[in-house]
Amino acid sequence: MPGWFKKVWYGLASLLSFSSFLLIIVALSLPHWLSGKILCQTGVDLVNATDPELVKFIGDIYYGLFRGCKVRQCGLGGRQSQFTIFPHLVKELNAGLHVTILLLLFLALALALVSMGFAILNIIQVPYRAVNGPGGICLWNVLAGGVVALAIGSFMAAVKFHDLTERIANFQERLFQFVVVEEQYEESFWICVASASAHAANLVVVAISQIPLPEIKTKMEEATVTPEDILY
């Protein structure tokens, strides 16, 4: 059985892995990966709007990996509309990249559970195989954190290099053309960053668990011999 010191740190490692699992689920379910401001370029061109009047033509948009919301501002007041990524909108995006992001996050969910299982195994017993010990915990956390980081990088690539927000904003728009004037990552994106950070923290936790504790030595009581002992 492992000592109490290692049990405490392995317990913390299992909690971090489980928290990463929960964070990914939250990030997948919330439609707040990115928000932005969209300008109705068609409306601006029609009325030849000047800078002070541009506010009337700037709407809002936010979205996640499955759904989102758009507020159109084309000079006649805001019109809000909800949209879903699947099954039609994804065809207008880089479908392969979007599906890859989802697959990576689902894989990260599985890897987070595996890393938690390995941490619990090391709490219960000392594995006889090195790959099941601290090295195994580190391996699965590196894989899980790396997969989450790859999903984050893929989403950033979709936003920056594949005009993700602009494609979503102009989906099924026949009369108006929208231009993205501002973008910022929202809580779901940063929740994924926190998930990857949890796995990185696990590497530190496992390293700390391997620090040998100083042995507490008790002084043996010196034997005293009395004259009575000699007589017997």
Curated annotation (Swiss-Prot):
Q: Which UniProt keywords apply?
A: Cell membrane, Cell projection, Hearing, Membrane, Transmembrane, Transmembrane helix
Q: How does it sit in the membrane?
A: Multi-pass membrane protein
Q: Which residues cross the membrane?
A: 8-28, 101-121, 139-159, 188-208
Q: Name one GO biological process term.
A: stereocilium maintenance
Q: Which Gene3D superfamilies match?
A: 1.20.140.150
Location in the cell reads: Cell projection, Stereocilium membrane
| InterPro entries according to UniProt | Clarin (IPR026748)
Tissue specificity note: Detected in inner ear, particularly in hair bundles of auditory hair cells and is enriched in apical stereocilia. Detected in eye, but not in brain or muscle.
**Cellular component aspect of the GO annotation:** stereocilium bundle; stereocilium membrane
When this gene is knocked out, what is seen?
Mice homozygous for an ENU-induced allele exhibit an early-onset, progressive hearing loss, with a lack of fast-graded voltage responses. These mice harbor an early truncating nonsense variant (Trp4Ter). By postnatal days 6 (P6), mutants do not exhibit any gross patterning defects, or differences in the overall number of outer hair cells (OHC) and inner hair cells (IHC) bundles compared to controls.
Q: What PANTHER family does the database record attribute to this sequence?
A: CLARIN (PTHR31548), CLARIN-2 (PTHR31548:SF5)
Summarize the protein's role: Plays a key role to hearing function. Required for normal organization and maintenance of the stereocilia bundle and for mechano-electrical transduction.
Family to which this protein belongs: Belongs to the clarin family.
What's the protein called, per UniProt?
Clarin-2
- Source organism per entry reads Mus musculus (Mouse)
Whichever gene encodes this chain, its name is Clrn2
